[in-house]
Structure formats: C-alpha cells, structure tokens
C-alpha cells in the first residue's frame, strides 16, 4: 500500500462516515497494480479491516475503464455488498459508471455461464477486458465456480482481485488454487511440499518458500488492523497450549454412547457423527447415523427421560442434561452472564434440533417462535434465542438488524444467536459480550474468522468491559490433562485422546505451518511511498475535506489551514483554490462535531457548515429523486 497516503491522515477521525487511511492507501496500490499493470492481486487483509469497502471503492474507480464483475459466496452476502455499495457511493468523490459493475452470487453466476452443467464457452467473450473481484476467494475452489474462474483466466487473460482474510483454509495446498488464478506459472506442488502421513503434516519446503516469494512478490496486500479501540478478550477454561479450553466432563450416559459411536468411525476426523456426540447424544439415533430419522420417529424413547416425536424432543433429560456436558455447562453459566451471546455450532440439522429444545426446556423463548417453559425474563420480556443456518427461510439481514440494533445492546430483543458456518464470513455483529464454541471449528482460520466477526472495531460503546470466549471440549469423565506443548503426546497417544482434544491438537499442528506461510506473505506485501495516483486524487481530497470540517464549523474563505490541507495533494496553489471553490459551490457533504450532518456554504467571506436533515410530510409515501419534481402523495 501507499504509505504516503496514510501519512496524510495522522489524526484521522473514525467516528463519522469516512474512508479509513489504510483503505485509501490500498486503493492506490490496487489501481497501480490491476489497472495500470494488469496484474492480479491477493488482498490479504485480516478480518475487520474493511475489505468489502476497499473492493467496492476499487470497483467504482475501475468502472471508468472496464467492466467489473464481483462474485460473492451467497445471496445474503450479495445483499450486504449492495448495501455497502450505497455507503461507498456516498463517500466517493469522483466519476464512475455504475452500469459497468455487476455483482453476482456464485450460484447465479454459475447459472448464466453453464448449459446443462457444461460451460458455455461462446458466452465467455463478454468478460474480455474485464476485472473480476472474488470475495472469500479461498472458498471458491473445488467446485464449478473455481473451475469456471480458471477457464476465464486462461481464455480471457484478465486480472483478478482476490479477497481473503485467511487464504489457507486447511493446509498449504489450499493456497495453490489462489496462486494458479493469480499467475501463469505452472507449479508442481509435489516439488514444493513435504507430505507426512497425516493431513496436518504438510509443510512448505525451502524450494516452496522461494517459489511462493517469486510468484507472489508484488501481488500481495497484507494488512491487520491495530488492536486499539477494542475490548479485551477474556479466554476461559484450562490452559491449553497458547489458549484456554473449557473441559466439559461427560456423564456416564453420554460417555457410553460417545465411545460406542467412536468405535464405529473409520476416520473420525472427517465424520460428522463425532461432532454430533461431542455436542450431545441421542441414543440409538447416533448409532443409525441417519439424520432423516430425526424427523420420522413417532414417540420413540431415546433414554428413560427423553423421547422424540416427529422431530420434536421432549422429556426431563433436556433439563438434567446428562446427554450433553457442553450444554450442562452452558445453561449453568449463562445465568450469571450479562449481555448478548454468539454461539457457534456445526451440523445444522442435528445441532439445531438439540439447541432448540434444550433452550425452550430451560426457559428461553424462540425469537418470533415458541415460548420457553417458565420463561426467563429481561426487563419484563422473555429472553430469546435465534438459530441461524444456511437453510433458514427468513431474511438473515432482518434478524441481524434486530440483533445489532441499539435497542438490543443488552440482549433484551435477541440475547442468544446460535449459528453454523454461515456466520464465519462477511457478516458483522455488534456488542457481543459472550462468544461460545459448542463445536471445535474445522480450522483455526474459521475460529479466528468467527472471533473477527464478533469482536469488531467501532462496535462497542464500552471497551473497558472484556468479551468472554468459551471454547468447549467434551472430555471423558476422568480426563484433566494439562497440555503445554505439541510434543506432549506421540501420534499414537493423540489418537486415544477425547475427540475434541485430538481435533484441537491437529488444528494447532496445522496452524503452526499456516502462520509461517502468512509471515512470508506479510513480508512480501507491497509497500511504497508516492503521491496519490491521479485516478484517486479526488477521493483522497474528499476525505481530507471531511476530516478538516469535522473540526471546523466556520472559517474564512482563504483559510491557510484548509489551503495547506488541500495542497498536501494538489501542490499547485491555484489548483487548490479552484478545488476549494468547487466543493463549496457544490455544497460538499461533511460531518461536523457540532452540527453533525452538514453541507458547505459560502456566507459573505466565510465557509460555513450548515446542518440539514431529510424530512417529509406525513402524507408523502414516495419520492423519485431522478426527477426534479415528482412527489407521489395521497389525494
């Protein structure tokens, strides 16, 4: 990124509508690399740094020269991008051609480029002289979308902007797909890795390090937001390597069925049933391992105090919770905790069923759904929970608007938000005070993404109060090992450990190599010092003006401070004065610390900030802003 751009904003104010300095500095780099040099770029910015805003700023700049295609993982994230586009346009002080920007979910993009599951090669010519932006790029490979991107890259010879906060999802091999999309180099990955017996024993050898540096040099933008303006994180549980884990010792009932299921697994690290019984056991249903039966059984007894009928669980066991050491800990602990909770779990069908009926049986009511038994209250209202899965029919955006609203800062509208993997990417949560992992994530990048979505800058009123993190592991009734090093166990001994502990150790092994590669990517990230690129000068100037008038409500028209600020980019005095006149005559929008939302006006020999607000008469129900006078009202 362009360090000179960051230097322009040493005392940047972030609590107003703005473009952050690192976003402008990265935009400068993208314009130089992708538009000027036609190179592909990996935007490796850690979660919470505003990759979406950077991508959309770049799309608007690039739209003046080329068509821009943006691919996002699903329809819900598509809505987020469309909303964010409106936000970015309001801050964008330059020309753009919105008709040249196309945003698709991967499924809809697939549908317009395939006929009967075969790529329509004749239609790919539409992507000539285009730019592709791919959100969460690490997730598009291994499916038809990844295949299509590779074909477009080879056929159309166009650049890609790949967005990822975690380009290695599982092992270093996953990075190979990103490299292949960014470069024309042919790589034999057998030559650059060391492969052990286990999946986590995949290491980049010395030759691989050199290949990585040579191919990606000049194609990486790395950034991690400073940890300032964030609450502290309080990890709970027993010390476990460099983190903490809550050991949830199983009851004899759970342990018995857990062991029986484990004996049935051929490769337990890849079988959902081990995740299931680590969360909770459901008797014979776990042995059958067929989730469809969950919704077919009629009054089937699972345990003496637990039955299932047409997908509904009922019985005293949902309160005593011998079926789940994790939920026994969770239900007991939440009684004493304040604020909102975010709870991650996997296997949405199995997990969603268990969560719903345990919560209802323990007095927590379903948001817009069933009321809990003897409902627990907050401010006279039921304490509610919501379960988010990829299958949910209701609008996820509406649910998150309620969860993130100021009125819900204390959790009085939705206190508990349970979610499967869908929430690990692209969504933002606010005022989360308690984060729970009911299932061990498949990768530590997923674990970090969930933390990143939940603990965000500018999302907390009070950063002096810590955020609690609970990583729960189901362990045997007599297990209490303290694990301080990855060398504490041999591979054979690891296989005898509780499944959750074994999975955590595997993830830590893989994370060690992932962090080594991330360090390499960080070191080859491009950094330089130059004046802002001509294509982004107006955008940079707009942010300079916004920052200046946050502090100043009224100045002389020839104020030297404003002139100096503008001349930091426009070195010519006459050009700077002309620019100032244009923004005042055009009533530039700013946010002032006294008047809030304001427009610039000339009054006698002064430039003043004039507050405004949009209002309407009660009978007005629609306004078409494309016509000067077109107010639709009732008779």
Curated annotation (Swiss-Prot):
SUPFAM superfamilies the record matches: P-loop containing nucleoside triphosphate hydrolases (SSF52540)
UniProt keyword annotations, A-Z: Activator, ATP-binding, DNA-binding, Helicase, Hydrolase, Nucleotide-binding, Transcription, Transcription regulation, Virion
Entry function: Acts with RNA polymerase to initiate transcription from early gene promoters. Is recruited by the RPO-associated protein of 94 kDa (RAP94) to form the early transcription complex, which also contains the core RNA polymerase. ETF heterodimer binds to early gene promoters.
GO molecular function: ATP binding; DNA binding; helicase activity; hydrolase activity
Domain annotation Helicase ATP-binding: ranges: 32-185
Enzyme's top EC category: hydrolase
Protein name per the record: Early transcription factor 70 kDa subunit
Binding site for ATP: 45-52
Native source organism of the sequence: Myxoma virus (strain Lausanne)
PROSITE patterns noted in UniProt: DEAH_ATP_HELICASE, HELICASE_ATP_BIND_1, HELICASE_CTER
Pfam families: Helicase_C (PF00271), ResIII (PF04851)
Domain Helicase C-terminal residues, every copy: 326-505
Cell membrane is among the record's keywords: no
Subunit (UniProt): Heterodimer of a 70 kDa and a 82 kDa subunit. Part of the early transcription complex composed of ETF, RAP94, and the DNA-directed RNA polymerase.
Biological classification of the source: Viruses, Varidnaviria, Bamfordvirae, Nucleocytoviricota, Pokkesviricetes
Annotated EC: 3.6.4.-
Cross-referenced InterPro entries: DNA/RNA_helicase_DEAH_CS, Helicase/UvrB_N, Helicase_ATP-bd, Helicase_C-like, P-loop_NTPase
Main location: virion
